[in-house]
């Protein structure tokens, strides 16, 4: 399923997203995060030791809710982890997100030895207001 133009617009803007994955016991885990898109996938940059990535390795289902400035400007994407990207591309991507969200040339937090990973999220269903 391709991404709706509203999803692309919200993901390309400096809008925060809530990412929901499933813990091993089935409980949902929600985290607030930066989000991006390449036009085909939603992109979330994380660290490989984080719980959300562990959850996705076990169960690839994920929901991403992106909120705009207006409370009626949002998109919910229910989907699955389609692929991951690591290495220098993931490090460059977190720097890109730092510029987009906090106007910093590089990501302001230390990057651990595990590095960064981009989660490429494919949409299975998109819900929009209205």
Model-derived regions, located:
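Extreme N-terminal tail/first-helix region
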Residues: 1-16
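Short beta-strand segments
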Residues: 14-47, 63-66, 76
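Short, surface-exposed beta-strand-loop junctions and turns on beta-sheet-rich folds
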Residues: 50-52
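Exposed loop/turn and edge beta-strand positions of beta-sandwich/beta-sheet ligand-binding modules
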Residues: 29, 60, 115
């Amino acid at each position: 399923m391709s991404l709706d133009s509203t999803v692309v617009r919200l993901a390309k803007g400096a809008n925060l997203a809530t990412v929901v994955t499933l813990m091993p016991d089935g409980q949902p885990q929600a985290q607030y995060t930066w989000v991006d898109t390449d036009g085909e996938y939603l992109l979330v940059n994380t660290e490989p030791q984080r719980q959300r990535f562990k959850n996705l390795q076990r169960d690839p289902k994920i929901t991403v809710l992106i909120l705009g400035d207006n409370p009626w400007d949002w998109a919910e994407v229910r989907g699955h982890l389609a692929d991951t990207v690591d290495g220098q591309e993931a490090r460059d991507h977190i720097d890109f997100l730092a510029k987009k969200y906090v106007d910093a040339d590089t990501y302001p937090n230390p990057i651990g030895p595990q590095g960064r990973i981009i989660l490429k999220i494919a949409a299975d269903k998109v819900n929009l207001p209205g």
